[in-house]
Curated annotation (Swiss-Prot):
This is Large ribosomal subunit protein uL14. Keywords: Ribonucleoprotein, Ribosomal protein, RNA-binding, rRNA-binding. Binds to 23S rRNA. Forms part of two intersubunit bridges in the 70S ribosome. One of its GO terms (molecular function) is large ribosomal subunit rRNA binding. The gene is rplN. One of its GO terms (cellular component) is cytosolic large ribosomal subunit. One of its GO terms (biological process) is translation. Gene3D superfamilies: Ribosomal protein L14. It comes from Macrococcus caseolyticus (strain JCSC5402) (Macrococcoides caseolyticum). Part of the 50S ribosomal subunit. Forms a cluster with proteins L3 and L19. In the 70S ribosome, L14 and L19 interact and together make contacts with the 16S rRNA in bridges B5 and B8. Belongs to the universal ribosomal protein uL14 family.
């Protein structure tokens, strides 16, 4: 469960290392986000020479959470960290590589480019 002021690692090579959540998109008064949800965040830590700079406001999709998500068959999938991928307005990633596994729930949100770039889909 990701909410305002949550810090997440960035799982792509866009140049950002860590982001801070500003807002959870999808309805007024929505408090929390889970895997596959889009958030607005600001870059808190970035690598030099990257596409994304520190202080920039970006949109991102959540790909891993510690709290996990429940699947239709009753199983749960949880990860060791909270991570996101920075996206453009057309739901495509800003970077060209994705690091670490991503959840299968991203397919339902039409983030097919992220799923295809990921080394592992759980």
């Amino acid at each position: 469960m990701i909410q305002q002021e949550s810090r997440l690692k960035v799982a792509d090579n866009s140049g950002a290392r860590e982001v801070l959540t500003i807002k959870v998109l999808g309805g007024s008064g929505r408090k929390t986000a889970n895997i596959g949800d889009v958030i607005v965040c600001t870059v808190k830590n970035a690598t030099p020479g990257g596409v994304v700079k520190k202080g920039e406001v970006v949109k991102a999709v959540i790909v891993r959470t510690k709290s996990g998500v429940r699947r239709n068959d009753g199983s749960y999938i949880k990860f060791d960290e909270n991570a996101c991928v920075i996206i453009r307005d057309d739901k495509g990633p800003r970077g060209t590589r994705i690091f670490g596994p991503v959840a299968r729930e991203l397919r339902e949100g039409n983030f097919m480019k992220i799923v295809s770039l990921a080394p592992e889909v759980l």
